[in-house]
Regions:
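Juxtamembrane helix-boundary/capping and inter-helix hinge elements in multi-pass membrane proteins
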Residues: 17, 46-49, 114-118
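Interfacial segments of alpha-helical transmembrane regions
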Residues: 43-62
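Hydrophobic alpha-helical transmembrane segments
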Residues: 28-48
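N-terminal transmembrane-helix/juxtamembrane module of multi-pass inner/ER membrane proteins
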Residues: 1-35, 66-93
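Membrane-embedded catalytic cores of phosphoryl/pyrophosphoryl-handling enzymes
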Residues: 39-40, 53, 63, 78-205, ...
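Transmembrane alpha-helix boundary/anchor motif
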Residues: 3, 47, 64, 68, ...
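Short helix-capping/hinge motifs at transmembrane helix termini and TM-loop junctions
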Residues: 47, 73-74, 139
Length: 214
């Protein structure tokens, strides 16, 4: 976290209005886990089970990596530096990188890459930027948090899209991802800290997907 990032958040805090706060509280919901779960369930039952698996996997893998980085970096949230943060119930754990931004950037850009429609790519870009701005406006993340979150989210969706095209047996992708992440999760499991709870839950989802695929 740099000094100018804190000053930027203070400047944004001065721009808050009742309307903007309600607006950005609505936008930030796009990055929440509940929406991702509802999306996957809808895809599974109404669209395509394989697509649902892929969206679920890339997002869960992305959020697991997000949790690992958070707990290595251990950057405190802006409210610990005097920022009057809003919607603190969405700001669990450490600050860097932004989980909401990364999660949304992952699954939304995955759709953009999958369907290759110009209008969809433009819409996804606007929404990713909106979610990132919402996290800054609400004072729960620094600019660097959301920028890195976007880069990681889009990067993981690109990698996932590539692997799904090249590797025909999806079970291998699920299993190897689970095995690669396991040492990090076991390491953090030795530390009794409630801040790791979200990472454990997300990792468990990947393990479940790997298990049911066999």
């Amino acid at each position: 976290m740099f000094a100018f990032e804190l000053e930027f958040l203070k400047w944004l805090e001065g721009l808050r209005t009742s309307f903007l706060t309600v607006f950005f509280e609505g936008i930030t919901i796009l990055g929440e886990e509940t929406l991702i779960i509802l999306l996957v369930v809808a895809l599974w039952f109404a669209v395509d089970k394989k697509l649902a698996q892929q969206v679920f996997f890339v997002t869960a893998a992305s959020l697991s990596l997000n949790g690992i980085i958070k707990n290595f970096a251990q950057v405190p949230r802006p409210f610990t530096k005097g920022i009057n943060s809003v919607r603190l119930d969405t700001a669990t754990g450490y600050s860097f990188p932004s989980g909401h931004t990364q999660g949304f950037a992952t699954w939304s850009s995955f759709f953009a890459l999958k369907f290759k429609k110009t209008w969809l790519s433009i819409l996804v870009s606007i929404l990713i930027a909106s979610v990132a701005i919402s996290r800054l406006y609400l004072g729960v993340h620094y600019p660097g948090d959301v920028i890195v979150g976007i880069l990681l989210g889009v990067g993981i969706s690109i990698l996932g899209n590539y692997l799904f095209k090249k590797v025909k047996d999806l079970k291998k992708i699920y299993l190897w991802t689970f095995l690669i992440l396991t040492p990090f999760i076991v390491c953090f499991a030795c530390i009794a800290d409630p801040l790791f709870a979200d990472m454990f839950k997300t990792f468990g989802m990947i393990g479940g997907l790997a298990a049911v695929s066999f």
